[in-house]
């Protein structure tokens, strides 16, 4: 079995604008335009040389219903506000949604603790917020402001932690739906004639069927992306796409906020002791969203097949060796059994292949990557863009499988992991960090 694992670097290698900052830049332009009456009165945009402006022009003046939906999703969206004012985005045009969301959620979670270590209930009034953005946004609801109002005989306003949590969650779902519109109505309609040699070699192979005739066998694909890039460039239209597992969901234009199944969340940050007890913010976590949104998990079946095959191999090997050790018949038969056992001892199990392309091996996907890589009958090839990217992938892999396991699997007779440079490198040097994001 061949399994191809793809992250956002796969889409970037096909010159598609799928970085978070690409999307955020689009939203920023969209908001600026719809909030400028003079432009709307013109009936068209004057400058549409950049494809993103060409799309915005088409969206505003030709797709009014979709435009209205997008406006409702991004206008006054607390996450859009937070990302746009983020210093990293403002100074370097770079942002990691998942990391930033995690910072906000963890700060709010921590704010619920009293000085004595006890945690307040979600239904209780918010006292203070440590995140600078949230503190500024909800400053009039803090305990200090309520006290100040009371001193002037005013009535201080209050808000509960639950109300803040729910606003963050609802606006996250709106953000995800807005991203879905961007990907399906813009990115997936972008012309893309770039096909990667490395992927072409992996996608399909000629095998003999039960009737002896040659057939084309397509590899399994585990996609961490929301887009259909792999399907439209590497699969024939008549091919059934049941070999693709969209682990983080798949973008579809005519979805809604309610039935969208795209996963955009955070990794577990609580200790083992706390994570099963404190579930106030569980809806923001990736594992929860995968279950709740019923995204793909076909890879589980692939892993099970791989492990069952290895178990069967070991059992058969043990059976042959035990038979040789226990045989008490004539010398010729005993010799034959021992020769067979000797041959079996050195025999290797049939290997399956996992190819990882455009994925940073970030620890947020640790559980999935471990299931694929940590099998004795799996050979993993990790593609890298340059030596800097390779170095980062090695560092991330240590966090996923551990230093000792990585050393064992990258050298000697037990080698099952190798790093391989990509054959296709149209990305410019300054884009390599963005290539890492999955």
Model-derived segments and their meaning:
Residues 229-231, 388-396:
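Short, charged/polar "capping" segments at the starts of alpha-helices
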Residues 27-52:
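Conserved phosphoryl-transfer catalytic core
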Residues 437-438:
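Hydrophobic alpha-helical segments, chiefly the membrane-spanning helices
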Residues 396-416:
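Acidic, Ser/Thr-rich peripheral helices and adjacent loops at domain boundaries
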Residues 1-34:
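An N-terminal structural lobe/cap that precedes and organizes the functional/catalytic core
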Residues 51, 55-295:
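Extended, H/D-rich, highly charged conserved domains that either
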Residues 425-434:
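Conserved small/polar residues in nucleotide/adenosyl-binding loops
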Residues 3-9, 219-225, 283-368, 380-386:
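Glycine-rich anion-binding loop/nest that anchors nucleotide
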